[in-house]
Amino acid sequence: MKKRFSKVIIAKHLFDGINEKDYEGYLCLSGNHIVEKKAGKPEKDILNQAQEVLNFRDELVMPGITDTHTFFTGYAIYHVGADFSKVTDNEEGCCILRKYEQKRHPEGALLGHGWNPEMWDRQNGEEMLEEKFPNKAVIIFSADRSCCIMNQKARNIYQFSAETCYPESYYRIMREYLNDREFIKKEFSDYMKMMNSRGVTTVKEMGFDDFYGFTDYLKELEDSEDLNLRTFFMSQPVGEGMNLVYARRMREQFTGNKIRFSGFNRMTDGTIASYKGDLKEPYENQDFCCKDPVPYEEIEKDVLAADAEDFRWSLHAQGDGAVGKITEIYQKCKKVQGKLKNRHAITDMEFTDPKDLEILGRIGVTAELYFQIMSLDPADVLINNIKQTIGTERGKYYWNRRKMQDSGMNLSGATDLPLLLTSIPESIYYSCGG
């Protein structure tokens, strides 16, 4: 006789995301669906109807986690092309490139990853590339993605340099590796497994411009058994402006609950430590509020145009000035019973004005917060940065998550992966002030 449940999970500590505390309980699964959830211990009849029973006494059983800001396109750079992690000289490097070219025959650039600048000198490597590959673009990324070895052919075609090696500058190569099906199929599969192993089952993924064709692969995956990560993706305008035609097409194309278009994403100001965060009042011992101007008029125009068509925006802001300007913009968006209809968000929110947080909470803005970012620097470095840039008085409102929560904002965790790899324990620790 066929059993009702494919699996029953019994847990001493079950956290369902609805109740504030965990409790003893069990889950009954049929295939990939939870069909029953109850407190207490299961009756013998329930167990007899299960193909498999899992019993957890010390572990916490909980729903999958959502990371609200990930960047698979940047993560893939760690593994793109040939592996140069053990290369120490030009001869080895040239040999690996020749083998890769003969095996893969790429139409565009020859790509590589894992280069160690301490093992293989960049200048020597680039001289070899000019001699051996004068007519083929070559780009070899360092192990941490912060720089690269490249030839002049690559500089001319892709319009960036080893000194400006960051995603927004090398976006022109993304179409090539995102459409390399042999590479991307395994890479995205490994990415999903890595995220699942960390408890993540849903991501809000950033894709530059029109995602350079990667949505074709997502469409193929949508109803596949190979999809283990719900993917809600946003368009971040980089090589072109906001594209509402593309947005409409994506909204029509993805209508299920596994993959969906989620709107637009954009950076506004920069970090406060670099004096590029936009402040309401000048920096300590300075006469300016931000080193670089922020095009708020352009941002407002895009946000209101997208909002008119019911698309979301997520704006990345770090200074209280930037957060304040975004607050003003969001107040002009469509509302239903006083709350934003399209659930716009602000990312990071490093330093904020409590008055703005109250308004943001009142209109229903979501905060996408990089909790783990506090792990990147020692506490004394962070404290000194705050003292030097905004001072101790304003510093009271740095990472003011308590006020965000009290004001009614919806707080969500993000990593900007691969800046940080999602860690639930670290996120909990740092979100509570660790």
Where are the language model's segments positioned?
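Residue-level recognition of beta-strand microenvironments
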Residues: 37-40, 264, 349
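Non-cysteine beta-strand/loop elements that form the S-adenosyl-L-methionine
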Residues: 71, 258-276, 365-375
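Divalent metal-binding segments
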Residues: 2-11, 15, 19-246, 271-305, ...
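Extended low-complexity acidic/polar segments
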Residues: 134-135, 253-259, 283-288, 359-383
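Glycine-rich beta-alpha junction loops
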Residues: 145, 235-239, 265-268, 350, ...
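Acidic (Asp/Glu)-rich catalytic clusters
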Residues: 221-224, 249-259, 307, 337-339, ...
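His/Asp/Glu-enriched, well-ordered alpha-helical/loop segment
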Residues: 175, 186, 304-314, 321-344, ...
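Short secondary-structure boundary/capping segments
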Residues: 125, 219-221, 248-250, 279-281, ...
